[in-house]
Amino acid sequence: MTTVRVKENEPFDVALRRFKRTIEKIGLLTDLRAREFYEKPTAERKRKKAAAVKRHFKRVRSMQLPKKLY
């Protein structure tokens, strides 16, 4: 469980921002959204494989030289 201690004379907004940052860093919200609905194991594998292919092609595309624009 994540805890954020509010310091003396610290505004609530600053403490809330620190809390949100720690929640984002540990990936709690993304994990909760992923577990919100049941996903079949085959669907999960298919989604992860598609994401890996997309990352691969994105990496390959970024390594290519840009086309000449003339």
Swiss-Prot record:
One GO cellular component term noted in the UniProt record for this chain: ribosome
GO biological process annotation, one example: translation
Classification via InterPro entries: Ribosomal_bS21, Ribosomal_bS21_CS, Ribosomal_bS21_sf
Gene Ontology terms, MF aspect: structural constituent of ribosome
Protein name: Small ribosomal subunit protein bS21
Gene: rpsU
Keywords: Ribonucleoprotein, Ribosomal protein
Record family assignment: Belongs to the bacterial ribosomal protein bS21 family.
Pfam families: Ribosomal_S21
PANTHER family (alphabetical): MITOCHONDRIAL 28S RIBOSOMAL PROTEIN S21, SMALL RIBOSOMAL SUBUNIT PROTEIN BS21
Lineage, highest ranks first: Bacteria, Pseudomonadati, Pseudomonadota, Betaproteobacteria, Burkholderiales
Database matches in PROSITE patterns: RIBOSOMAL_S21 (PS01181)
Organism: Methylibium petroleiphilum (strain ATCC BAA-1232 / LMG 22953 / PM1)
